UniProtKB/Swiss-Prot annotation:
Gene: grpE
Keyword Kinase applies: no
GO cellular component, as recorded: cytoplasm
Main subcellular location: cytoplasm
Assembly description: Homodimer.
Keyword Chaperone: yes
Annotated protein name in UniProt: Protein GrpE
Gene3D superfamilies: 3.90.20.20, Head domain of nucleotide exchange factor GrpE
Pfam families: GrpE
Cellular localization per UniProt: Cytoplasm
Family under the similarity heading: Belongs to the GrpE family.
UniProtKB keywords: Chaperone, Cytoplasm, Stress response
């Protein structure tokens, strides 16, 4: 500082330097905030991804185990359906009760672990995502595209299909009443007049 310069004359330069430093610090703070938010988002995404992978691994393990048990569930269901319920033999009656209780307990265990049975009722709309049509037959009781009978129940685990329900479907030209949620004729692959030679029905494979 020369003799002619005074402290008051230097103050504008010092104020400018301070203002620039403040702006630089503000910019650095903003960058750090943005970086912190980005790291937090990445951490949350990593957490969600880990949880999803863990749930998928758990669901896969249960699905594989459940698939191994479906055969036993099918056999118990068939045994219950074809058991002589009008039998007067106490031993037979007790055996039937035991089979029914075993099937009920197995289905309860399935439900507790997220395994849901797919067992459409007669007349329900065919759903290609949940059902597999193994045959189609003309019907006067069910409208075209409706389920006539379930040949084998299906199962889904936490929204993921384990096995589609094997069903017989009412063929084109069937005259039964339509279910309330039946698709429009233009969207129903079974609707409309039966084609010549289709009266006996044919195999239809619609794997989910």
């Amino acid at each position: 500082m020369t003799d002619e310069q005074t402290p008051a004359e230097e103050m504008p330069f010092e104020a400018d330097d301070a203002a620039q430093e403040i702006e630089a610090l503000k910019l650095e703070v903003a960058q750090l905030k943005e970086q912190a938010l980005r790291y937090a988002a990445e951490a949350e995404n990593t957490k969600r991804r880990a949880e999803r992978e863990m749930n998928d691994a758990r669901a896969y393990a249960i699905q594989k185990f459940a698939r191994d048990l479906l055969g036993a569930a099918d056999n118990l269901g068939r045994a219950t359906a074809h058991s002589p319920k009008d039998s007067t033999d106490p031993a037979v009656k007790n055996f039937i009760i035991g089979v029914e209780m075993t099937e009920k307990e197995l289905q309860s265990a399935f439900e507790r672990n997220g395994l849901k049975k797919i067992d459409p009722a007669k007349g329900d709309k065919f759903d290609p995502h949940l059902h597999q049509a193994v045959t189609e037959q003309p019907s006067t009781e069910v409208a075209a595209g409706g389920v006539l009978m379930v040949m084998q129940a299906g199962y889904e685990l936490m929204g993921r299909l384990v096995r589609p329900a094997m069903v017989a479907v009412a063929a084109k030209g069937s005259t039964g009443p339509a279910s309330p949620d039946a698709p429009a004729a233009s969207a129903n692959p079974y609707a409309g007049a039966a084609a010549e030679g289709d009266s006996t029905g044919g195999a239809f494979d619609a794997k989910a």
